[in-house]
């Protein structure tokens, strides 16, 4: 089919940098660039068709971006616009002269229904994409946790290689901020704005409190209902621990309870208070020293009973001894039948003989 169509070669003398041929064959779109030969001249050969022997083939040249007609071809003026044209006779004359040589580049393009030849330039333009920066403000409802876009701003970035390299290296925007999303937390309406920062997301704040083996979370709630916040001194903590130990060991022998309470009071008081025991002039009445004996099913031993009587008869106790002293009577479980009852070896002896606090107390009472 290609050989049956008449061919015509369009030419332009050397001088320009680039020339494009356009006309009725491509609806004046400027899609067919001409080929530059070694001499610097431009030419292109393509098939032409005529509807009738009197019809004309209109065309024009685009020389370095300017639409110009050629003086080597016939010119038609239509409403002040000049265009070149050829007829079927011009094609026959050129073929008889033997100058109608088909250029390979133009033949393939003409057969492909005048495909656009400036596609590479269009691709270059497409590669230069416009860059935008989108800033969103997101509103978060604290009750439901639902997020919605409160506002959105689109800013076009300037075409700068330095800025592009900076974004690729640092991973930040042109304004130097590491994030463009703003979170608004509210209960009913908009209360506040705060920018999200990466280190806040990776390191949430956790408030630690001293509890019974548990740690509170960010909302101040503990994982156990038994845990509590201690705001006591070291002496109060020690006292609570000793009371818990006494509650746990309530079923054991209570013969040494009086000595434990007295030693606890002695450990708590500083040296300045213990020095008051040496002042005999500070005395209180006998009624200030009381004793409480807890009755049990088993009769107490005689030694403990004599101790309580001795405390009640003595006078002149110092102010520091005004505290209540609980003398728990020692108990002893019942022995099986057939055994002879013997004194309890675990019964505490007279504290005045052991020394310490009770020894000083006995000396002062004398």
From Swiss-Prot:
Claim: Cell membrane is one of the keywords in the record: yes
Residues with the Phosphothreonine modification: 216
Any one of the GO BP annotations: signal transduction
UniProt keyword terms in alphabetical order: Cell membrane, Isopeptide bond, Membrane, Phosphoprotein, Ubl conjugation
Entry keyword annotation includes Transmembrane: no
Covalent crosslink: Glycyl lysine isopeptide (Lys-Gly) (interchain with G-Cter in ubiquitin): 314
Cellular component per GO, a single term: plasma membrane
Topology relative to the membrane: Peripheral membrane protein
Biased composition (Basic and acidic residues): 265-284
Note: Present with 1240 molecules/cell in log phase SD medium.
Name by which UniProt lists this protein: Signal transduction protein MDG1
Species the sequence originates in: Saccharomyces cerevisiae (strain ATCC 204508 / S288c)
Species classification: Eukaryota, Fungi, Dikarya, Ascomycota, Saccharomycotina
């Amino acid at each position: 089919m290609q050989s049956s169509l008449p061919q015509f070669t369009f030419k332009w003398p050397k001088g320009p940098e680039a020339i494009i041929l356009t006309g009725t064959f491509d609806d004046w779109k400027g899609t067919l660039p001409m080929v530059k030969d070694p001499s610097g001249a431009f030419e292109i050969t393509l098939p032409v068709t005529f509807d009738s022997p009197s019809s004309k083939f209109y065309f024009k040249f685009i020389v370095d971006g300017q639409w110009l007609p050629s003086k080597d071809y016939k010119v038609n003026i239509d409403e002040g616009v000049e265009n070149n044209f050829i007829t079927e006779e011009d094609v026959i004359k050129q073929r008889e002269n033997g100058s109608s040589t088909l250029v390979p580049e133009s033949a393939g393009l003409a057969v492909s229904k005048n495909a656009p030849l400036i596609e590479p330039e269009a691709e270059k333009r497409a590669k230069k994409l416009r860059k935008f920066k989108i800033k969103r403000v997101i509103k978060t409802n604290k009750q439901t946790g639902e997020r919605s876009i409160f506002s959105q701003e689109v800013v076009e970035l300037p075409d700068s290689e330095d800025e592009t390299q900076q974004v690729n290296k640092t991973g930040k925007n042109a304004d130097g901020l590491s994030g463009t999303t703003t979170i608004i937390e509210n209960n009913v309406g908009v209360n506040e704005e705060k920018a999200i920062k990466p280190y806040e997301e990776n390191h949430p704040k956790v408030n630690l409190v001293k509890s019974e083996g548990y740690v509170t979370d960010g909302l101040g709630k503990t994982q156990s209902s038994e845990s509590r916040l201690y705001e006591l001194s070291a002496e109060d903590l020690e006292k609570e621990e000793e009371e818990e130990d006494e509650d746990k060991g309530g079923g054991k022998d209570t013969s040494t309870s009086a000595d434990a309470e007295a030693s606890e009071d002695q450990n708590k008081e500083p040296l300045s208070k213990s020095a008051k025991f040496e002042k005999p002039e500070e005395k209180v009445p006998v009624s200030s020293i009381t004793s409480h004996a807890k009755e049990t099913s088993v009769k107490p031993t005689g030694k403990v009973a004599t101790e309580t009587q001795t405390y009640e008869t003595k006078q002149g106790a110092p102010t520091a001894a005004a505290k209540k002293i609980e003398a728990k009577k020692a108990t002893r479980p019942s022995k099986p039948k057939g055994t002879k009852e013997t004194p309890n070896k675990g019964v505490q002896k007279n504290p005045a003989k052991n020394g310490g606090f009770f020894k000083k107390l006995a000396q002062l009472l004398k």
